[in-house]
Each structure stands twice: as structure tokens, then as C-alpha cells.
From Swiss-Prot:
Keywords: Cytolysis, Dermonecrotic toxin, Disulfide bond, Hemolysis, Lipid degradation, Lipid metabolism, Lyase, Magnesium, Metal-binding, Secreted, Toxin. It comes from Loxosceles gaucho. GO terms for biological process: killing of cells of another organism; lipid catabolic process. Its cofactor is Mg(2+). This is Dermonecrotic toxin LgSicTox-beta-LOXN8. The lineage of its organism: Eukaryota, Metazoa, Ecdysozoa, Arthropoda, Chelicerata.
Amino acid sequence: ADSRKPIWI
């Protein structure tokens, strides 16, 4: 949901 960081983090 947080587009500022990669989904795997």
C-alpha cells in the first residue's frame, strides 16, 4: 500500500 518503498519491505 505504501508506494514510497518496495512491496517486499
